[in-house]
Amino acid sequence: MIAGTANGLIDDLPWDLVDYPAAGTIFDHLTSNGIGWVNYHNVNPTRLLLKRSLGAAGLIAARRIAQLGRLFPAIVHAERGNKSFTAGLYPLGLAGAVRHLRTTKQFFADADAGTLPPFSIVDPDFGDFSEENPQDIRKGESFASEVVKHVLHGKGWADTLLIWTYDEHGGYYDHVPPPAAVPPDDVLGRDLVLAWPAWLRALLRPLLRAALTELTNADAGPTSYDRYGFRVPAVIVSPYARPGYMTSTVYDHTSILKLVQQKWNLPALTRRDAAAQSPLDALDLDGEPAFGQPPDLPAPSLAWGPW
């Protein structure tokens, strides 16, 4: 969703993310063209960067000393959510993302005041309320409801488009077979660890035994990116959204890139987003906005934190 390609990676383990897409990410294109953007996250940016710099092992050790009695799995779970944010997926791009990080609390304030930047990404806490198993999905729904509510009733509502979506299907069955897709590039699926010399992998095997087994199994799968995955929900929230609009057009996550590129006349990152369908057809920009007056939405089953 940020680069239009997986750049051949078949996992997101830290030692693989030192790679970087040849054409960069949408954040690189926005920055080079002077277009403001912010990645909002549930953790204060200073703490977030410290966590990423220390790495999981060092941070866990520090937490064990400072908070005796806490269980190791609980710490790992917390740090997983605390360290993950969209703009920092590739560590090589972390330095350029630093000044674009803000807290979720700041997003609510900016949305209320109508001072959101031209482009924003709002991340959940991937450890506690991203609706992933085994989380309480009501927390994720409550977070999404809170984000939508602040956009709906914020001073910038008349000029805002929010796309609420998910990065994966979550394990639910889909009766529709995924169709073929345009390959983003010519980079085949591979794992950087499996490309290491055999002697190095043998040396590190005691430390990475489970990961190496998992990667070996994954590496036996498809190596091309020429097919979509299972469908995921996507909701358009805008004054100009077409009421009750349904479409059979095939979209994917790079459709968001396509929309951003259309708005600011930016070049495509890969063949995939160049061929993507833009979700503009879900908007009616010619007439009066159907939702100029924000609708009242039902409250979520679980009120927004603290939990």
What residue spans do the PLM features occupy?
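N-terminal pro-sequences and low-complexity stem/linker regions of secreted or lumenal proteins
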Residues: 1-307
